[in-house]
Amino acid sequence: MTFPLLPAYASVAEFDNSLSLVGKAVFPYAADQLHNLIKFTQSTELQVNVQVESSVTEDQFEELIDNLLKLYNNGINEVILDLDLAERVVQRIPGARVIYRTLVDKVASLPANASIAVPFSSPLGDLKSFTNGGSRTVYAFSETAKLVDVTSTVASGIIPIIDARQLTTEYELSEDVKKFPVSEILLASLTTDRPDGLFTTLVADSSNYSLGLVYSSKKSIPEAIRTQTGVYQSRRHGLWYKGATSGATQKLLGIELDCDGDCLKFVVEQTGVGFCHLERTSCFGQSKGLRAMEATLWDRKSNAPEGSYTKRLFDDEVLLNAKIREEADELAEAKSKEDIAWECADLFYFALVRCAKYGVTLDEVERNLDMKSLKVTRRKGDAKPGYTKEQPKEESKPKEVPSEGRIELCKIDVSKASSQEIEDALRRPIQKTEQIMELVKPIVDNVRQNGDKALLELTAKFDGVALKTPVLEAPFPEELMQLPDNVKRAIDLSIDNVRKFHEAQLAETLQVETCPGVVCSRFARPIEKVGLYIPGGTAILPSTSLMLGVPAKVAGCKEIVFASPPKKDGTLTPEVIYVAHKVGAKCIVLAGGAQAVAAMAYGTETVPKCDKIFGPGNQFVTAAKMMVQNDTSALCSIDMPAGPSEVLVIADKYADPDFVVSDLLSQAEHGIDSQVILLAVDMTDKELARIEDAVHNQAVQLPRVEIVRKCIAHSTTLSVATYEQALEMSNQYAPEHLILQIENASYVDQVQHAGSVFVGAYSPESCGDYSSGTNHTLPTYGYARQYSGVNTATFQKFITSQDVTPEGLKHIGQAVMDLAAVEGLDAHRNAVKVRMEKLGLI
């Protein structure tokens, strides 16, 4: 509840600043004073009210409506109007905040919660009853009321409207001074059940942050109002002038009381070390949230060390503006509750930096919010043209996948389908590359510029875990690698097979004498520092760690760095750590996504910079890999682009339906954007039905059935007549995994584009994923037309050399000079010419 008094002024020019602690004022309405009234309202913390005192003609009514709209929309709190005029205004201005000035016999016709102003001469019992137990605000007005009338009215819960010239903040008045002490009006509204007669008093700052709890008395309150400072009642020492000895003084901004009138709130401006005797701002502990951030930024504005990020923001207007726009864009893109909260906090930080830079306080921001809430008319609210984009034509929405019902692939008979239908069936789920790049770029830039700090923040944001360090260094603790014996044996066997296959790929040095005296060579050298990305996502994939780590070790890479997102408790899956130990990894970056890729590409304080990055991942990982590869400052290459996992199975009537379906589902469970394709060669409807039944029956038994259901919804069975037709379509599709469950395996020779081929009924794709020895890091999304899967050579680069003897120069020298002359490169020609001249060859 506010101070129980409404001072009335003849104009804003007569405002008495000593009465500002009352917190409100009322001024007369005058059309020619509208500008001054609005200007005053926008410059003060007071609740400003307006009183329309004179009658209004019909000609003046429309002008009044227009002016009241301006007043409301610029922060005027309430308008006092005669009953009839008020009712007309409310009809014209929905939401108009009015105080009905009326006589007591008219009050019953008004809404029970409508604010009213009635004469002091009304019976006090009636006035008190009009408050409806506190749900209605009742004002009383008179030019002739006496102090005893005012105090008794206030004691009944009524707010008097008093000419400000009759009010004073003094309380020891001579008999000839006919003014009302503001303190007596306040005291009349207070009650206490304490034996000592004191009033519990909460002290708060202008932002409503509690500083401490004290006591006030009938002596301290008048003195506080007179001095406009924090004066309280000490139970041992009498009046307590806050800060009189410590220097931590208080300017009294306002006094409020609670709904029962037995507790006060002093709103103050605190100076010095703070309110608390422990030299803290508050007795209730440190501030948090926006207030704490504001205090820190105002301190940094004066004291930030050179080179600090906040100092950069204060000094670099372009950087600060760019960060505000960047964070606003990220907030607009955020979808989850956690991401929205995170991005909003970032935006608040940079916005508060700008406020602090230009001397704008949170109180001023909140004042503007409060004023906006008082508007009764609204703008249309459209964004400015520069912030809107022409709406693209509505794309056909993907069909909604039912959460129940039969799980089955779409079916197409190639002999009856159009070429467009076939093309659509083989089209992968759309990857919105441009949008993904826009999301990834700020992440990559953040890590590049801010290193470990950004990496830790992004891990907290995306993985939900706060880490002290982003790196787990080798040697890795034994307790982090504890595995069941069967799992350890499986990993060891898989590592051994992958090692054997990749060691066999090591190439001998190639040496060719192209003509007498000219020997050309090619030899392999390992890439020195490699970064291996091990995905997390919907499934933990420790197998990827061995598929990347073993070839890196075989190739002889000197520095192997793993990166994998941590679990919610900050740890990694022990299988990944065990493999890292087995392949001699230097460290494991505890991060996933684009931030992990950026850390390995550019290096941070703790993450070594890598020369090449390997490994599959989601669309954000792929976008980050492609982004850093195209940044010449990163000097970092990648193994290949990657997309969602996929399989194409070619099966004939001799294939076991259960085998076929198990291969399809083993890829479908990777993710909802995975795709599986079945090319059914010369199958009857009955044979196809057996496969369809097996799809549903096996799928519903899987723990990841909901992922499978959504993947199968955009996957297809295509019926073809011949093996040749199936292989042609497979080469067109260029699958990551190609499985041939056909009677005659000789068709392998016709495979032109595939990441890896699995031949025969007993070669499930799962074997290649784990233990057969081939690598499971393969090109997806059709990139098998241009890229190989990861192999030993992927971790090497090949250097050529040539050794030319005088005899060799005799054979090729003239040809070199002639070609250099054709290209106009005389220095090239001369490098051969001077040698041949000294040899006497020309």
UniProtKB/Swiss-Prot annotation:
Active site per database record: 736-737
Compositional bias annotation for Basic and acidic residues: 390-403
Renumbered residue ranges of the record's region Phosphoribosyl-AMP cyclohydrolase: 1-275
Cofactor(s) needed for function: Zn(2+)
Catalytic activity as recorded in UniProt: 1-(5-phospho-beta-D-ribosyl)-5'-AMP + H2O = 1-(5-phospho-beta-D-ribosyl)-5-[(5-phospho-beta-D-ribosylamino)methylideneamino]imidazole-4-carboxamide; 1-(5-phospho-beta-D-ribosyl)-ATP + H2O = 1-(5-phospho-beta-D-ribosyl)-5'-AMP + diphosphate + H(+); L-histidinol + 2 NAD(+) + H2O = L-histidine + 2 NADH + 3 H(+)
The protein's annotated pathway: Amino-acid biosynthesis; L-histidine biosynthesis; L-histidine from 5-phospho-alpha-D-ribose 1-diphosphate: step 2/9; Amino-acid biosynthesis; L-histidine biosynthesis; L-histidine from 5-phospho-alpha-D-ribose 1-diphosphate: step 3/9; Amino-acid biosynthesis; L-histidine biosynthesis; L-histidine from 5-phospho-alpha-D-ribose 1-diphosphate: step 9/9
EC code: 3.5.4.19, 3.6.1.31, 1.1.1.23
Superkingdom, natural source: Eukaryota
Gene3D superfamilies: 1.20.5.1300, MazG-like, Nitrogenase molybdenum iron protein domain, Phosphoribosyl-AMP cyclohydrolase
Region of interest (Histidinol dehydrogenase), ranges: 358-842
Any Gene Ontology CC annotation: cytosol
Any one GO molecular function term: phosphoribosyl-ATP diphosphatase activity
One Gene Ontology term from the biological process aspect of the record: L-histidine biosynthetic process
Keywords: Amino-acid biosynthesis, ATP-binding, Histidine biosynthesis, Hydrolase, Metal-binding, Multifunctional enzyme, NAD, Nucleotide-binding, Oxidoreductase, Zinc
Cofactor info, note text: Binds 1 zinc ion.
CDD domains the record matches: Histidinol_dh, NTP-PPase_His4
Region Phosphoribosyl-ATP pyrophosphohydrolase, annotated ranges: 276-357
NCBIfam families: hisD, histidine_hisI
Name of the protein in its database record: Histidine biosynthesis trifunctional protein
Organism: Komagataella pastoris
Gene name per UniProt: HIS4
